[in-house]
Amino acid sequence: MYHVVAATTNPAKIKAISLAFDDVYGPGQYRIEGINVDSGVPLQPIGSTETRTGARQRVSNARQMRPEADFWVGVEAGIEDNMTFAWMVIEHLQWRGESRSASLMLPDIILQGIRQGRELGDEMADLTGISNVKHKGGAIGIFTDGKLTRTSVYHQALLLALVPFNNEIYQRPAQ
C-alpha cells in the first residue's frame, strides 16, 4: 500500500488527490496523510512561476517531514492576469510529475480585491456570503453553479501529473 503525503489539509484538495489515486492505482491501494506545510510563497500567489514554486516547495517540505512516504503531492492555487488556476506537483522516488489545471476567468470586482492584497477565497466569501469557500467547491463551483468544482478541476490536473509514474516512456533515458 502506497503512503501518499498531501502537502495540505484542505479537504477539497485532499479529495482531488484521493480521486486521482483511485483512478490510477485503485481504491484501497494507498493511504493519504494530509499535513500542513509552508509553501514559501504569499497566501495568494500571483503568476504561474510563483504558484508553481509554491507547489514545489510544499512537496519539498512534505518530503522533509515524511521522508518514508512513497508519494508527496503539492497543490497550489494562484492568480495570473485575470485567471485563477493551480499547479500540481507529485514526486515519487527520483521522478516528478507536474501539471497546471484549467483556468477560470475572474470578474473585475474579484480582481480588484486581489490587487489590494486579499485572497480569492476571502473575496468570494464577502461577495457570496459562503464561508470557507476554498475548502468547498471554490470559486469554480460558485461560478459554474456546481457543474465543476475545485475538486473536479484539480482531479483532472492531478491525473495528468501522475502520468510520468505510470507510463514507461517517461522513464526511458534520452538518446
UniProtKB/Swiss-Prot annotation:
Q: EC number(s) of the enzyme?
A: 3.6.1.73
In the record, what terms sit under GO molecular function? Answer: ITPase activity; metal ion binding; nucleotide binding; ribonucleoside triphosphate phosphatase activity
Q: Where does Mg(2+) bind?
A: D38, E68
Q: Which UniProt keywords apply?
A: Hydrolase, Magnesium, Manganese, Metal-binding, Nucleotide metabolism, Nucleotide-binding
Name its co-factor(s).
Answer: Mg(2+); Mn(2+)
Report which superkingdom the organism of origin falls in: Bacteria
Quaternary structure (record): Homodimer.
**Which Gene Ontology terms describe the biological processes this protein takes part in?**
nucleotide metabolic process; thiamine metabolic process
Q: Please tell me where substrate binds in this chain.
A: T8, T9, N10, P11, A12, K13, E68, A69
Q: Report the Pfam families cross-referenced here.
A: NTPase_I-T (PF01931)
| Protein family per UniProt | Belongs to the YjjX NTPase family.
Which organism is this entry from?
A: Yersinia enterocolitica serotype O:8 / biotype 1B (strain NCTC 13174 / 8081)
Protein name (database record): Inosine/xanthosine triphosphatase
General function of this protein: Phosphatase that hydrolyzes non-canonical purine nucleotides such as XTP and ITP to their respective diphosphate derivatives. Probably excludes non-canonical purines from DNA/RNA precursor pool, thus preventing their incorporation into DNA/RNA and avoiding chromosomal lesions.
Q: What is the lineage of its organism?
A: Bacteria, Pseudomonadati, Pseudomonadota, Gammaproteobacteria, Enterobacterales
